[in-house]
Each structure stands twice: as structure tokens, then as C-alpha cells.
């Protein structure tokens, strides 16, 4: 049967929500059941989990180009459907200089890269609700890594190979072209069988991204359908694709492919056996070099913490690694990148002057119940960080360009008298003795506390007295320094705490009312430097809609 005939039976392209292509079939998911009284014998109609699906066997008459044409038509409509959700709603929790979504749910940063004199950054977006469903990619650009401008909804879940989500991936700047690599996610049948493919897209002269379709269609041996988040690098005279993977034994591993042309990929092997049972899945791989050392970043899922306050299975890790002349990878020594509540799926980019800069998702996969959901949006990205390899460990520092948003420093005496900052967007530098407690974002009812437990040499971050609705409330970090040097970045509903010159970082969402802008220190009296933070340009397509 011709696709035109199937579309006519479906009631036209405007009645088609998805196109699927499972096992020699073509399936059109419909908004409404077709009005045709009798369907041909070779066409079936069924309701699958509340979605009407019209199916026919795929014949030689149906080409990939025809399927792509339907995908483009669906994408055009999907982009129009996001327009009402591109207006950012005013909210007391919305950051002034971090990237947040106008509405809906933001998660992983994607495609972070410097290309042709500009920085590009994408993020995962579900525009229509604060839930993880049918992911899109939003495209932002910047000249300075501080002010980001909305460009477009770059990719939508419109094609048979990504019908249930354009999952995470990275970008490649090759010659004059900007390529995107991502995981296409589809769900098939009443049991929602997952089908995973690695896909590519390329930016055209108009700044739009044209999908090239799947570049890896089949799973490597020994791996489940949980294989995703391609990172593509050029090394040893060839392209390599790194993928987070799950083995049939439900162990996380790194899958590696190679290619000569970015389009045809060949599987090499799985890496990571030296870590043993190190989580049931590895997500969001990144790979880079820093001061002559190679590093592998990933998100291992299913690692239990020895601390009873840490109950979240979604972890973050960076490992020092090596790759020999034959391309064999070994993972050596690893650490958490962030030890706060809300940090996942980081990506890095190299700046024009050679720095390695990181951006992460200030959220976690299971969190969908933040107070900002009452205003129709959830999650944000972290502040950008510069990475440094020094004295055998990774140090992280706030991006130096963020200094352009800072006011002149104000000396602030921290004591048990509450000082009203009258803002929740600031930077604070202070060195604290053991045995004291710093309270931030406080009023008479709410606060977040940083306790320096002298007896146990623990830095304890406690957000139990905030408006948090979901997630852990205490994080503890063992330190051995005689004092604790802090550099704190606050932005309305977030804290990023850089400890002892960036040796550790704790990133957290902190929800307190708009008037909770007090700060105090109990158990000591110390001078601090306070900087007020100015807003960055709003990373939205449409102006913020201020609610009365």
C-alpha cells in the first residue's frame, strides 16, 4: 500500500501524532480514530494504551524518503504546538542568570560546543508538562558563555526512529558543519518495548537541523536496549563514538564504536570491566583531555551510598583514564564531580582559548515535584564551571566570565544577627572555622544550613527547613582542612557551593519564599565578601509573562 493511501485512511497528516516502523510495518498513531467506515483487509486499527494506531505491512513501495517526509510534516506541526509554551512564566523561583525552560521540564544539557566563533548549547525539553515524556531539543547560542539567546526548537520527536523522544547526545564541529548525534527512542506495542537507535542531524545554511536518520540501527552483542547518549570524538586518526550501556547482566559499561566518515559506524567493544559491579546502567558519557590527562565522565545508576542520608541512585563520576595506541581504554581513578543534591548528566566543551568548561543538569531523573511546577516549569542548568587538573585531582571553579555579572564586593560581617540581603541572587566568599553554622535564604520559618561539624570533620548541607517536596534533605562531606573556604553562588532557588578552592562542589535546588533572603552565622563571627549578581539575558524566545 502507498503511504498516501494510508495517510488518507488516517484522516490526513494533521490527525497523525507519530509514525512508527516496527518489524516490517508502518504504523501511524492518530489523535482520533479514522472516520472511514470500512478499512481495507490489509490495514489494521487498534487502541494501544489509549492511542489509536493504524498499521500496514511495509512494502518496497514505501521508501525511507517517504517516511522522512511524514516525519518532517509532523515536526513542523510539533514546533508550532510548542509556541504557547515558549513564553516564560514569572515565578519567584526562576533564576536570573542560569538557564531554565520557559515552561515544562528541562533536563540534560546536550551538544555543548564552540563552532564557527559561537558557543552552542542545547537542552532536553518536554514543553507541555513537568514530566519526562517525548523529549525535544532547544537550541541556544552565546558569544560569551554568559548571555544565551534562544535560537529554535532544533529537534522534535517526529520520526519513526525517535517517535518517543530525541534523547541526549553531543555535537561535533567538522570542517564547516555542525553535527548533532543523539539517541532516538521509540516505544512499541502494548508492552511499550523500547527500541533504541543512534541518530545524526546536521545544521543547514539557515541554521536549521536536518535529520540524517539512524547511523547505528542494531544493538551490539551482550547489551540491552539501554544504550544511549552518544559522545563523538576524533582521536588516533578516526572518529570514536562513546555510549553509555547496560549489559545483559544488568551492569553499566562504556560501548565504543569507530568511523571514518561520521555516518558508517563499527562496534569495537565494551569497556569498564575493571570496575566490576559499578551500577546497573551508565548514562551520559563524556571524554576529554586536561593538562595531558584523559578523563571519562558518566552517570552510573544503582550505586548505593554508605551515608544513610544519601538515598538517590543516580550518581555522577569522573574517572582518570588512558587509551593506548590500539585504542584500548582503561579506567583508573574516580571521584564524584558534585556532592550536593541536584547534579546530573554534565557535558563539557573547550573554549576558544583552550579552557575545559562544564555544564550540568541541576536536577535528577526522578524529580518532578518541585514548587516551581505550580507555575508550570521545572529544573535548570548549572552555572558553567572551569575544570583544572592539579595535584592529582580535579578542581572546579565558576566560569570567570560570570564575574561580569558581579557587583563590586561588599564586606559583610556574618554573625548570629540576621542580615537581610534583599536578594537571593548573589555570590559569597568566606572562610569558616569548624564548629559554626551558616544559614542562608532564611526568614522566620525557612532556611538552608551549612554546618561545620567539628567533632566529625563533616560539612553538612541541610535543606529540610525549605519548601522542597521531593528528594533527600541532608548531604555530608568529609573534609580534613583546618578551616573551610567557601565560594557560594546563589540564584533565587539554587546554591552552588565551591569548597576549598573548588576541591569539592555541592549543587542544590533550595526553595524558600521570595522574602527569605536573610543570612546569619552561628558559633562564630566572620567577615565575608558579598557580590550582588545582575541578571543575564533571558534564554527564552518570548518575554517573561509576569503574573499579577
From Swiss-Prot:
GO terms for biological process: sucrose metabolic process. The keyword Cytoplasm applies. GO terms for cellular component: cytoplasm. It catalyses: Hydrolysis of terminal non-reducing beta-D-fructofuranoside residues in beta-D-fructofuranosides. InterPro entries: ConA-like_dom_sf, GH32_Enzymes, Glyco_hydro_32, Glyco_hydro_32_AS, Glyco_hydro_32_C, Glyco_hydro_32_N, Glyco_hydro_beta-prop_sf, Suc6P_hydrolase. It is found in: Cytoplasm. SUPFAM superfamilies: Arabinanase/levansucrase/invertase, Concanavalin A-like lectins/glucanases. The active site is at residue 108. Keywords: Cytoplasm, Glycosidase, Hydrolase. Pathway: Glycan biosynthesis; sucrose metabolism. It holds the Pfam family Glyco_hydro_32N. CDD domains: GH32_ScrB-like (cd18623). Substrate binds at residues 105-108, 124, 167-168, 228-229, 283. Its EC number is 3.2.1.26. GO terms for molecular function: beta-fructofuranosidase activity. SMART domains: Glyco_32. Gene3D superfamilies: Exo-inulinase, domain 1, Glycosyl hydrolase domain, family 43. Enables the bacterium to metabolize sucrose as a sole carbon source. Belongs to the glycosyl hydrolase 32 family. This is Probable sucrose-6-phosphate hydrolase. It comes from Vibrio cholerae serotype O1 (strain ATCC 39315 / El Tor Inaba N16961).
Amino acid at each position: 500500500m502507498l503511504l498516501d493511501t494510508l495517510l488518507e485512511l488516517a484522516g490526513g497528516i494533521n490527525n497523525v501524532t507519530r509514525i512508527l516502523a516496527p518489524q516490517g510495518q508502518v504504523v501511524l498513531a492518530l489523535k482520533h480514530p479514522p472516520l472511514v467506515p470500512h478499512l481495507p483487509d490489509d490495514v489494521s486499527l487498534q487502541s494501544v494504551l489509549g492511542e489509536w494506531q493504524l498499521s500496514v505491512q511495509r512494502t518496497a513501495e514505501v521508501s525511507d524518503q517517504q517516511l522522512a517526509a511524514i516525519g518532517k510534516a509532523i515536526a513542523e506541526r510539533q514546533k508550532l504546538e510548542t509556541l504557547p509554551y515558549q513564553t516564560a512564566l514569572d515565578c519567584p523561583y526562576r533564576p536570573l542568570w542560569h538557564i531554565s525552560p520557559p515552561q515544562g521540564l528541562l533536563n540534560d544539557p546536550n551538544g555543548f560546543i564552540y563552532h564557527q566563533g559561537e558557543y552552542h548549547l542545547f537542552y532536553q525539553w518536554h514543553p507541555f508538562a513537568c514530566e519526562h515524556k517525548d523529549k525535544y531539543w532547544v537550541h541556544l547560542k552565546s558569544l560569551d558563555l554568559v548571555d544565551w539567546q534562544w535560537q529554535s526548537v532544533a529537534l522534535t520527536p517526529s520520526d519513526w526512529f525517535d517517535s518517543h523522544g530525541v534523547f541526549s547526545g553531543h555535537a561535533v564541529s567538522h570542517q564547516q558543519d555542525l553535527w548533532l548525534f543523539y539517541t532516538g527512542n521509540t516505544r512499541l506495542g502494548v508492552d511499550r518495548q523500547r527500541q533504541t537507535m543512534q541518530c545524526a542531524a546536521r545544521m543547514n545554511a539557515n541554521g536549521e537541523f536536518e535529520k540524517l536518520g539512524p547511523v547505528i540501527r542494531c544493538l551490539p552483542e551482550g547489551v540491552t536496549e539501554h544504550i544511549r547518549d552518544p559522545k563523538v570524538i576524533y582521536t588516533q586518526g578516526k572518529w570514536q563514538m562513546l555510549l553509555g550501556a547496560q549489559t545483559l547482566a544488568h551492569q553499566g559499561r562504556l560501548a565504543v564504536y569507530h568511523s571514518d566518515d561520521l555516518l558508517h559506524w563499527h562496534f569495537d567493544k565494551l569497556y569498564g570491566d575493571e570496575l566490576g559491579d559499578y551500577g546497573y546502567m551508565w548514562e551520559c558519557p563524556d571524554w576529554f583531555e586536561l593538562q595531558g590527562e584523559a578523563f571519562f565522565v558518566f552517570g552510573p545508576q544503582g550505586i548505593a551510598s554508605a551515608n544513610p542520608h544519601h538515598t538517590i541512585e543516580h550518581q555522577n563520576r569522573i574517572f582518570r583514564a588512558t587509551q593506548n595506541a590500539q585504542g584500548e581504554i582503561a579506567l583508573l581513578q574516580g571521584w564524584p564531580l558534585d556532592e550536593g543534591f541536584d547534579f546530573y548528566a554534565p557535558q563539557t566543551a573547550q573554549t576558544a582559548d583552550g579552557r575545559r568548561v562544564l555544564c550540568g543538569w541541576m536536577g535528577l531523573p526522578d524529580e518532578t515535584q518541585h514548587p516551581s511546577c505550580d507555575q508550570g516549569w521545572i529544573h535548570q542548568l548549572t552555572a558553567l564551571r572551569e575544570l583544572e587538573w592539579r595535584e592529582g585531582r580535579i578542581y572546579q571553579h565558576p566560569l570567570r566570565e560570570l564575574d561580569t555579572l558581579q557587583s563590586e564586593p561588599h564586606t559583610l560581617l556574618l554573625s548570629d544577627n540576621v542580615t537581610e540581603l534583599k536578594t537571593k541572587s548573589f555570590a559569597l566568599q568566606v572562610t569558616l572555622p569548624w564548629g559554626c553554622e551558616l544559614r542562608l535564604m532564611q526568614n522566620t520559618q525557612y532556611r538552608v544550613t551549612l554546618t561545620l561539624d567539628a567533632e566529625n570533620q563533616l560539612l553538612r548541607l541541610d535543606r529540610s527547613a525549605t519548601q522542597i517536596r521531593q528528594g533527600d534533605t541532608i548531604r555530608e562531606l568529609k573534609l580534613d582542612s583546618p578551616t573551610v573556604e567557601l565560594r557560594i553562588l546563589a540564584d533565587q532557588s539554587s546554591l552552588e557551593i565551591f569548597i576549598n578552592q573548588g576541591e569539592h562542589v555541592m549543587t542544590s535546588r533550595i526553595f524558600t519564599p521570595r522574602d527569605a533572603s536573610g543570612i546569619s552565622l552561628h558559633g562564630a563571627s566572620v567577615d565575608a565578601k558579598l557580590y550582588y549578581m545582575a541578571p543575564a539575558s533571558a534564554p527564552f524566545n518570548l518575554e517573561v509573562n509576569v503574573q499579577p
